[in-house]
């Protein structure tokens, strides 16, 4: 799986849960 896709952990959007769209850490999802 692509490294930017994170599941069931603190994702790039700063919340715990399933990964959002592989966004940049500076963007809101």
UniProtKB/Swiss-Prot annotation:
<keyword id="KW-0379">Hydroxylation</keyword>
<feature type="modified residue" description="4-hydroxyproline">
    <location>
        <position position="22"/>
    </location>
</feature>
<feature type="modified residue" description="4-hydroxyproline">
    <location>
        <position position="18"/>
    </location>
</feature>
<feature type="modified residue" description="4-hydroxyproline">
    <location>
        <position position="2"/>
    </location>
</feature>
<comment type="function">
    <text>Probable neurotoxin with ion channel inhibitor activity.</text>
</comment>
<protein>
    <recommendedName>
        <fullName>Conotoxin SIVC</fullName>
    </recommendedName>
</protein>
<feature type="glycosylation site" description="O-linked (HexNAc...) threonine">
    <location>
        <position position="9"/>
    </location>
</feature>
<keyword id="KW-0872">Ion channel impairing toxin</keyword>
<dbReference type="GO" id="GO:0090729">
    <property type="term" value="F:toxin activity"/>
</dbReference>
<keyword id="KW-1015">Disulfide bond</keyword>
<keyword id="KW-0027">Amidation</keyword>
<keyword id="KW-0007">Acetylation</keyword>
<keyword id="KW-0964">Secreted</keyword>
<keyword id="KW-0528">Neurotoxin</keyword>
<dbReference type="GO" id="GO:0099106">
    <property type="term" value="F:ion channel regulator activity"/>
</dbReference>
<comment type="similarity">
    <text>Belongs to the conotoxin A superfamily.</text>
</comment>
<feature type="glycosylation site" description="O-linked (HexNAc...) threonine">
    <location>
        <position position="7"/>
    </location>
</feature>
<feature type="modified residue" description="Cysteine amide">
    <location>
        <position position="29"/>
    </location>
</feature>
<feature type="modified residue" description="N-acetylalanine; partial">
    <location>
        <position position="1"/>
    </location>
</feature>
<keyword id="KW-0325">Glycoprotein</keyword>
<dbReference type="GO" id="GO:0005576">
    <property type="term" value="C:extracellular region"/>
</dbReference>
<keyword id="KW-0800">Toxin</keyword>
């Amino acid at each position: 799986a692509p490294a930017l896709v994170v599941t069931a952990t603190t994702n790039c959007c700063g919340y715990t849960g399933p990964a959002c769209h592989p966004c940049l850490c500076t963007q809101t999802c």
